[in-house]
């Protein structure tokens, strides 16, 4: 388990539940000053009206607005703050909008149809990727003639380098939206396809990964779909469940290597770091697990690269092209954590996702790089219960429910955490802070479902001001194509970005910055605590604190 996550388990549970707030926050002048600073920055904000040399899209799979907020709290607390006041890297982007995520045939979408929207610019049907809505799920013969092409494909045609980074398998729905055309998102390898589809000429996703376009950087999981059936996995050579799956006998990794000069294949972090430093490498494939990568808290830091590591490597390799690059980066395990009902896994993945955004922002300039952060869909995830500011996002509500038992702030509308017809468990703070704890859910389903509400879009860089209002999800692809002067916007009329050497002093002037409150030594306890009240009300405050301590120690508090 990683060091910061150990800190989370051991440090947040007690200290933040009895946290103190800065005394200056009791003074209206504090809030007026913060608002005035934000207002002044907004007034000075000027759109960058040039074209974008580089295009980056960060996709937080399942990262709805409630997940963004909860991630902000968690990341802030990991950094030693109370939580909600501390901005995420994506929060610092100056432009934002809402995205309507429905697909052509579903009010609540999946990651395949949404990927087609934000990557290709066209909405489509559930479980299909890279095809128009004229195609039908699982019907191979509806593929041909209904293909739509991603902005990444158009960027490659324009001479840019392109890359895909994900914490899922690289053949999964979201990353494959950059290169695939398939009526079934689950056709990862040829062994996953029916014989009829193969006879009709449909290709599995792994085959299309290496044949549909020349992708310079491919980093994620998905080794088993690239090698002949029975091929031992290099990391798990004695595990028969992790061997290659291909029935056609093809070694797709070797085929990919033979196509490109300056190409390298790696399968662990050490190899990745080594090849990233080699200036002769212009094509890099790294597959770090047989299927999806491990959750970040379960990752071996010596063997398994983090999303931040992969993002940094991709930016460095792709930046070797003077014509620029297009990069897709997915925090794909956020979604899996939610499906399992394990909010701890989802939110710690989201923290790592934000760290990757932060690193990419450090490695690029907003003068020539349009960066967009968004989600494909939300989840039926929520948090509430009037928790005190500074308490762990994984903790309990301060008062019990009507059945006299405590409940967690985070809950799911449906999921595997449904408690059945019996009594609710008497959950403790220690249990609810565990990485494998499944949150209680209102409706029993094997896998918690997606949510249908709008998701956020954050943007910085050239043409980022086009991200505004409430938009259809496919609008995102059009913003990126237009900013990069790519098809169908090759006559965009935009000047190229200014030479970086002339703009280094103004690189970040257009970003609205949010001042992080620094807690001083002069502090006041949370409102209604004993030290913040006079003698007459002190007993009430002490009772509240005692109740919080009881919750932390696992005893039910009186409601």
Curated annotation (Swiss-Prot):
Record's keyword annotation contains Signal: yes
Residues that hold Ca(2+) according to the record: 235, 288-289, 304
Cofactor: record remark: Binds 1 Mg(2+) ion.
InterPro entries documented for this protein: Alkaline_phosphatase, Alkaline_phosphatase_AS, Alkaline_phosphatase_core_sf
Membrane topology: Lipid-anchor; GPI-anchor
Catalytic activity: a phosphate monoester + H2O = an alcohol + phosphate
Coiled-coil intervals, chain numbering: none
Residues making up the signal peptide according to the UniProt record: 1-19
Disulphide connectivity of cysteines: 140-202, 485-492
Location(s) in or outside the cell: Cell membrane
Glycoprotein recorded as keyword: yes
Family recorded in the similarity comment: Belongs to the alkaline phosphatase family.
Function, in words: Alkaline phosphatase that can hydrolyze various phosphate compounds.
Protein name as annotated: Intestinal-type alkaline phosphatase
């Amino acid at each position: 388990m990683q060091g910061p996550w150990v800190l989370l388990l051991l440090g947040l549970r007690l200290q933040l539940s009895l946290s103190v707030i800065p005394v200056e926050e009791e003074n209206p002048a504090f809030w007026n000053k913060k608002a005035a600073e934000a207002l002044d920055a907004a007034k000075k904000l000027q759109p960058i009206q040039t074209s974008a040399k580089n295009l980056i899209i960060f996709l937080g799979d399942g990262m709805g607005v409630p997940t963004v907020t909860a991630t902000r709290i968690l990341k802030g607390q990991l950094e030693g703050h109370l939580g909600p006041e501390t901005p995420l890297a994506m929060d610092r982007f100056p432009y934002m909008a809402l995205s309507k995520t429905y697909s052509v045939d579903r009010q609540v979408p999946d990651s395949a149809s949404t990927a087609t929207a934000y990557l290709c610019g066209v909405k489509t049907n559930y479980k299909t990727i890279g095809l128009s809505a004229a195609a039908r799920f699982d019907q191979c013969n509806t593929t041909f003639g209904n293909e739509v092409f991603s902005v990444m494909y158009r960027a490659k045609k324009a001479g840019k380098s392109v890359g895909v980074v994900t914490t899922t398998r690289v053949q999964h729905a979201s990353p494959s939206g950059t290169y695939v055309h398939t009526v079934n998102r689950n056709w990862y390898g040829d062994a996953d396809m029916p014989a009829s589809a193969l006879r009709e000429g449909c290709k599995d996703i792994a085959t299309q990964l290496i044949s549909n376009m020349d992708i310079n950087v491919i980093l994620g999981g998905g080794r088993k779909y690239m090698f002949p059936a029975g091929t031992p996995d290099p990391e798990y050579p004695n595990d028969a469940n992790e061997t290659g799956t291909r029935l056609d006998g093809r070694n797709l990794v070797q085929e990919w290597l033979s196509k490109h000069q300056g190409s390298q294949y790696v399968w662990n972090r050490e190899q990745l770091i080594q090849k990233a430093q080699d200036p002769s490498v212009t094509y890099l494939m790294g597959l770090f697990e047989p299927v999806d990568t491990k959750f970040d808290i379960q990752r071996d830091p010596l063997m398994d690269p983090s999303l931040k590591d992969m993002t940094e490597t991709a930016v460095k390799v792709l930046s070797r092209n003077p014509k620029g690059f297009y990069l897709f980066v997915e925090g794909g395990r956020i979604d899996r954590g939610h499906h399992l009902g394990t909010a701890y896994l989802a939110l710690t993945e989201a923290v790592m996702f934000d760290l990757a955004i932060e690193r990419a922002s450090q490695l690029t300039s907003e003068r020539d790089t349009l960066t967009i952060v968004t989600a494909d869909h939300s989840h039926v995830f929520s948090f509430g219960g009037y928790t005190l500011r500074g308490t762990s996002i994984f903790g309990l509500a301060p008062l019990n429910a009507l059945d006299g038992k405590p409940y967690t702030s985070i809950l799911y509308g449906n999921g595997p955490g449904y408690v059945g017809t019996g009594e609710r468990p008497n959950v403790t703070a220690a249990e609810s802070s565990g990485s494998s704890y499944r949150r209680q859910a209102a409706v029993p389903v094997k896998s918690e479902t997606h949510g249908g509400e709008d998701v956020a879009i954050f943007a910085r860089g050239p043409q980022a001001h086009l991200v505004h209002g409430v938009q259809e999800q496919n609008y995102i692809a059009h913003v990126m194509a237009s900013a990069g002067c790519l098809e169908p916007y090759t006559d965009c009329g935009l000047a190229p970005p200014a030479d970086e050497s002339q703009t280094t002093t103004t690189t970040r002037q257009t970003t609205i910055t949010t001042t992080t409150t620094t807690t001083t030594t002069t502090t006041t306890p949370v409102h209604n605590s004993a030290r913040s009240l006079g003698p007459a009300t002190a007993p009430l405050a002490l009772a509240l604190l005692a109740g919080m301590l009881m919750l932390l120690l696992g005893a039910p508090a009186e409601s």
